Regions:
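Nucleotide/phosphate-binding catalytic cleft detector across ATP-hydrolyzing
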Residues: 1-159, 165-177
Length: 177
């Protein structure tokens, strides 16, 4: 895989069942709930993240909340694409180039679910999209090198899913499912 060039926007996204976090250059750009507010009468998306919660509490008879990610997997493509588009626009306000995105994923996702996530990220505005096991993303986020001969066990404990992985010499061992 070609390494990121310095001229492009580089974004890392951790989209969990509860929270979505977006990083760039070791900085947290966004930390919001992974939730979409939907108008019950029109089925239109009317808010995302914190704004979705506020909209729901202002009119619970008209607004319902939808969580597009459950148990570490995308359960609704339309809402996932909508929330990703909104969050990317929010963090890339003035950017001229579309970003290259690395999305952390649960180790148990099927190939169909992986392709659907790549498609959603591309439609949300990515120039390129890559998937990285969440256990690897957690270790790299802590500054741990995964290409050394040392054995590293990394664990990510989320709301619905706990992922772990073992790394050594750049190789990754996924748990059996």
């Amino acid at each position: 895989m070609k390494s990121f060039s310095r001229s492009a926007n580089h974004i890392g996204i951790d989209m969990g069942s509860s929270q979505t976090r977006i990083f760039s250059e070791n900085r947290l750009l966004l930390d919001e709930r992974t939730v979409v507010a939907v108008d019950s009468k029109t089925n239109e998306m009317v808010g995302f993240g914190t704004d979705a919660i506020i909209r729901y509490h202002s009119n619970p008879q008209r607004i319902r909340l939808e969580w597009p990610i459950r148990n570490g997997a995308m359960v609704d493509y339309y809402y996932t694409k909508g929330i990703l588009t909104y969050f990317l626009k929010k963090v890339l306000k003035q950017a001229l180039a579309r970003p290259e995105i690395v999305l952390s994923i649960s180790s148990g996702l099927s190939s169909v679910a992986r392709h659907a996530l790549i498609d959603a990220v591309m439609h949300a505005g990515a120039q390129k999209a890559f998937l990285l096991p969440v256990a690897a993303a957690a270790a790299l986020g802590q500054g741990i090198r995964l290409d050394t001969p040392d054995v590293v066990l990394s664990m990510n404990i989320g709301q619905d899913v706990t992922d772990c992985g073992m790394f050594s010499c750049g190789l990754f061992s996924e748990p059996a499912h």
